[in-house]
């Protein structure tokens, strides 16, 4: 029996925007842990397409347990100082979605030193609402702390303040040759100090021998305190609600 399903689509068009929420709702009604992973348009694609995309996002939010939104506009910001071809930029957008789904799947399918399983993922993502899934890599001194910082640069964060998450799961990966030392775990303290006092945190340690001297941090955060933006009905959003969503996804980036 299927325990978990990922539903991915690009919002703003016809097929994905209309069909994905329906499919998601059918899966969730069957008790399947349902995770939506969607992309929303670049700002230059225009307000009509963006408005349609955000309405689709809201419909997805109503029909999934957790929703990851990858914003193409954030990719422009992150790579604004690089000479990147459009084709490569679009590939990056696809990569963000792929990495998110793959990282969640690996937590379930791989065996960790400090292990986490489907029940742990379910604890964090069941009825979790808006979600963050990000991955960061680092090596050298303070590598774990730096990996957390890199994870927080993810396009999946949008204008979300991770400090307001009430559920979190993170996994630290390292190779056999360059295992994480107990002393290195102190670096996590500085990250945790900024989180909500009532946050529920699960964590694990896994092996990945492709990393060499690097560590990888995979982070899932859900259940945000102030992100309950909902529509009054299935057809339309109020002007105020539209403004909140526009600011969340297309407003000025909040600096950490």
Give the residues covered by each predicted segment.
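Tubulin/FtsZ superfamily GTPase core signature
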Residues: 1-256
């Amino acid at each position: 029996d299927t325990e978990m399903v990922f539903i991915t689509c690009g919002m703003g068009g016809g097929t994905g925007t209309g069909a994905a929420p329906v499919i998601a709702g059918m899966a969730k009604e069957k008790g399947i842990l349902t995770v939506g992973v969607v992309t929303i348009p670049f700002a230059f694609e225009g307000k009509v397409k963006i408005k349609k995309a955000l309405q689709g996002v809201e419909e997805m939010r109503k029909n999934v347990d957790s929703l990851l939104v990858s914003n193409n506009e954030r990719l422009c910001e992150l790579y604004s100082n690089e000479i990147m071809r459009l084709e490569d930029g679009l590939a990056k957008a696809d990569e963000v979605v792929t990495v998110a789904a793959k990282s969640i799947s690996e937590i379930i399918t791989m065996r960790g030193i400090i292990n986490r399983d489907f029940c742990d993922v379910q604890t964090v993502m069941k009825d979790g609402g808006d979600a963050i899934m990000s991955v960061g890599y680092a090596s050298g001194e303070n590598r774990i702390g730096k990996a957390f910082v890199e994870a927080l640069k993810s396009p999946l964060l949008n204008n979300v303040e991770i400090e307001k998450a009430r559920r979190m799961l993170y996994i630290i990966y390292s190779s056999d040759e360059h295992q994480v030392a107990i002393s290195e775990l102190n670096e996590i303290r500085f990250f945790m100090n900024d989180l909500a006092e009532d946050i529920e945190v699960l964590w694990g340690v896994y092996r990945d021998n492709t990393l060499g001297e690097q560590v990888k941090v995979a982070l899932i955060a859900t259940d945000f305190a102030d992100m309950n933006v909902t529509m009054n009905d299935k057809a339309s959003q109020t002007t105020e609600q539209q403004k909140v969503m526009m600011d969340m996804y297309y407003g000025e980036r909040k600096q950490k």
